[in-house]
Regions:
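Short, well-ordered alpha-helical segments
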Residues: 62-102
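Extracytoplasmic
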Residues: 43, 60-62, 94, 111-113
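Post-signal peptide N-terminal segment of mature Sec-exported envelope proteins
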Residues: 26-46
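Short acidic, glycine/proline-enriched helix-loop-strand junctions
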Residues: 76, 104-123
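Bacterial Sec signal peptide processing site at the extreme N-terminus
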Residues: 14-31
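Sec-dependent N-terminal signal peptides
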Residues: 4-13
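A composition-biased, non-transmembrane "mature-region" signal
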Residues: 41-44, 48-51, 55-61, 79, ...
């Protein structure tokens, strides 16, 4: 019985969080996270980049992520926010994210959101 209650609590938690993280295709089409699950390149460390020049490996762009998920202070210091962002990134098969601070050309751009580019390293 306890497992059943815990299972439903997790479902409710993830369904509430999913609406705060929106995935878009490269073409700007809104995507469902359930449809995005793919395997990663085998690199197990999640990495957040603040500049494309920091990336040493070749990569391809998978998707874009937009979020209005609440965070304390600067988002990269908020452990809960970063944990959710990491889980979403790895779930979609990406190896890393690029924080897109100054890009306003994302689909349905909203200044209240943070935007990221999800990338996958080439093997």
């Amino acid at each position: 019985m306890i497992r059943l209650v815990l299972y439903f609590c997790l479902i409710i938690l993830f369904s509430c969080v999913d609406k705060h993280f929106i995935a878009y295709s490269i073409d700007g089409e809104k995507l469902n996270y359930e449809d995005l699950h793919t395997s990663s390149s085998g690199i197990s460390d999640f990495k957040l980049f603040f500049n494309k020049d920091e990336i040493d490996l070749e990569y391809t762009i998978l998707h874009f992520i937009a979020t209005d998920y609440y965070y304390y202070g600067q988002f990269f210091f908020d452990k809960n926010f970063m944990s959710m962002l990491k889980n979403k990134t790895l779930h979609m098969g990406a190896d890393a994210l690029i924080y897109e601070k100054d890009r306003t050309d994302f689909p349905n751009y909203n200044e209240n959101y943070l935007y990221f580019t999800a990338i996958k390293y080439k093997n």
